[in-house]
Amino acid sequence: MELWVSPKECANLPGLPKTSAGVIYVAKKQGWQNRTRAGVKGGKAIEYNANSLPVEAKAALLLRQGEIETSLGYFEIARPTLEAHDYDREALWSKWDNASDSQRRLAEKWLPAVQAADEMLNQGISTKTAFATVAGHYQVSASTLRDKYYQVQKFAKPDWAAALVDGRGASRRNVHKSEFDEDAWQFLIADYLRPEKPAFRKCYERLELAAREHGWSIPSRATAFRRIQQLDEAMVVACREGEHALMHLIPAQQRTVEHLDAMQWINGDGYLHNVFVRWFNGDVIRPKTWFWQDVKTRKILGWRCDVSENIDSIRLSFMDVVTRYGIPEDFHITIDNTRGAANKWLTGGAPNRYRFKVKEDDPKGLFLLMGAKMHWTSVVAGKGWGQAKPVERAFGVGGLEEYVDKHPALAGAYTGPNPQAKPDNYGDRAVDAELFLKTLAEGVAMFNARTGRETEMCGGKLSFDDVFEREYARTIVRKPTEEQKRMLLLPAEAVNVSRKGEFTLKVGGSLKGAKNVYYNMALMNAGVKKVVVRFDPQQLHSTVYCYTLDGRFICEAECLAPVAFNDAAAGREYRRRQKQLKSATKAAIKAQKQMDALEVAELLPQIAEPAAPESRIVGIFRPSGNTERVKNQERDDEYETERDEYLNHSLDILEQNRRKKAI
């Protein structure tokens, strides 16, 4: 068999130059047999007969091509063929994935040295020479290189990197189960994986006691702890911390709000302040404030403070929001499904309300009457999923606690977030409610005005106020009607109305603790004895709104505030109102009463005395003398008197007998 090779294929063979030009020069000088290669366009390509090459070069060329020349001809060198089932590639590369960075770097260091040694051996260089040459070039041990080379020979070349990974690290992490009796292992994990979260040291102490009792074979504490660390993390969290903590192992969803409009979606929640406040009724409490926040811009839109989270603070703060900013066409609200927030007065009629018994005839709640769509935060393992509401972040580190609870005006009243974090001046003072509410308003304003907010819409530059002002200008809203505003006010129980048109309202026990008298002249003529009153507890000395028991609006009533005994101006105002009432009443009488009493008398018909009726019974006349008639008349009178005495005596006897029987 004749073998023809190009000058490039001959380059770098033993005894030949390293370049094609050098090979051509040697070939011309030594007179190698050559020919022009066919099929080459645009020039001539020369190739040489392999028999013209020096013996060393020819042997290396044949070895490179997998052949060898003998006296009996050319033989193809047999190489081991690797079948797919010889080894598990996935398991091999899994070892690579589980290796440490240092193990992978070490494998990558040995890979080029092993590849170089393999190429030199394929070119016919002796094993000793090849390993020594490569080891000297890469500055590694020749014997170690030889071990690495034979280590990868049973794998395909693309898998050599994974095959070179040192498995000693993995072996150190594997604990032989033969050291640990299965019963002992089950005892340990049953003790360790409990909601009480016992310390591992104490679990191991109990394991040692049980092992001595039952003759179990157990490893050292460090080995057992490594075995515990190999347990599935999700399983450990679920058993020791609960389902709620397990759900937190899933990364939080990243949501965008860019597609929303300002005021299109709001969310609310209550925040318990860490401040002692002397409330309006004299009690020292930690008040709770309900906040409404715009989801897109994160601005706090409205709030109301109370002794607890209740329907009053929620509906009044909602009234503040819609009164100031209006109601968008596509309106959404997200709140927790708590007893205070998800009550029927606010959310009744919502199809997805899972609080209290839902009835088909439930009246629509105020949120739905305002055109809002209700959304509830999730409940996981009996606990709320707070990360679903952006307003929760306003209560976190650097939030409203820093702006309000730790304000210098409230120094000495701060309680700390928990009993373990009480300040040294804990309980020094309790601030008045007026001061606290003023500080709360200032803190919310500072919270909204701080620039450089790291939110999607602020971009690390703007404040919540800046973004809301920009986005709100592009939002279409409708202002609530007066009737809608009155619907959001607090409804009082039915109160009695006096004939003067005044009534007493005992309201605001939780918000103000007030008792006021209200009046409107229209109530005198409303024809009702009781009215239902709607009011704002923070405006009790202003106007309240009166409704009939079936919900029809009657009028507004103003508060009759007490005045000083020597207040002449108030006296003049009272006399002016008396004159006004007198004049208005006279005008009403004049308009209503259009005839006087004389005119009424003239219109009455003349009534004549009726004639005596005629008797239709005729008696028999028996004449007698006058003397006899008088005598008989006297006898009759005596008889009548005596008969009456007997009758009265008989009645007395009967009454006495009746009483005896009754006794």
Curated annotation (Swiss-Prot):
Region (Involved in flaps endonuclease activity): 575-579
Keyword Ligase attributed: yes
Outcome of swapping residue 599 to Q: Almost no effect on both the DNA cleavage and joining activities without bloing tetramer assembly
Variant or mutagenesis effect after changing residue 269 to N: Complete loss of both the DNA cleavage and joining activities without bloing tetramer assembly
Residues of the HTH Mu-type domain: 1-69
Cofactor (UniProt): Mg(2+)
Chain segments carrying region Interaction with and host ClpX: 656-663
Binding annotation for Mg(2+): 269, 336, 392
Subcellular localization, as worded in the UniProt entry: Host cytoplasm
Stretch list, region 1-gamma, viral genome ends binding: 175-247
Region (Interaction with MuB): 605-663
Swiss-Prot/TrEMBL keywords: DNA excision, DNA integration, DNA recombination, DNA replication, DNA-binding, Early protein, Host cytoplasm, Hydrolase, Latency-replication decision, Ligase, Magnesium, Metal-binding, Nuclease, Transposable element, Transposition, Viral DNA replication
Motif (DDE): 269-392
Protein EC: 3.1.22.-, 6.5.1.-
Family: Belongs to the mulikevirus repressor c protein family.
Note: This enzyme is structurally similar to and performs the same endonucleotidic reaction as retroviral integrases, RNase H, RuvC holliday resolvases and RAG proteins.
Subunit structure: Homotetramer. Part of the transpososome complex composed of a DDE-recombinase A tetramer synapsing the ends of the viral genome and the enhancer element. Interacts with target DNA activator B; this interaction brings DDE-recombinase A to the transposition target site. Interacts with host ClpX; this interaction remodels the transpososome for replication and is required for the flaps endonuclease activity of DDE-recombinase A.
Domain notes from UniProt: The catalytic domain contains two distinct activities, the cleavage and strand transfer activity and the flaps endonuclease activity. The N-terminal HTH Mu-type domain 1-alpha is responsible for sequence-specific DNA binding to the IAS. Two adjacent regions 1-beta and 1-gamma bind to the ends of the viral genome. Contains a D-x(n)-D-x(35)-E motif, named for the conserved glutamic acid and aspartic acid residues and the invariant 35 amino acid spacing between the second and third acidic residues. These residues coordinate the metal ions required for nucleophile activation. Each acidic residue of the D,D(35)E motif is independently essential for the 3'-processing and strand transfer activities.
Protein purpose: Responsible for viral genome integration into the host chromosome. During integration of the incoming virus, DDE-recombinase A cleaves both viral DNA ends and the resulting 3'-OH perform a nucleophilic attack of the host DNA. The 5' flanking DNA attached to the ends of the viral genome (flaps) are resected by the DDE-recombinase A endonuclease activity, with the help of host chaperone ClpX. The gaps created in the host chromosome by the viral genome insertion are repaired by the host primary machinery for double-strand break repair.
Record's protein name: DDE-recombinase A
Native source species: Escherichia phage Mu (Bacteriophage Mu)
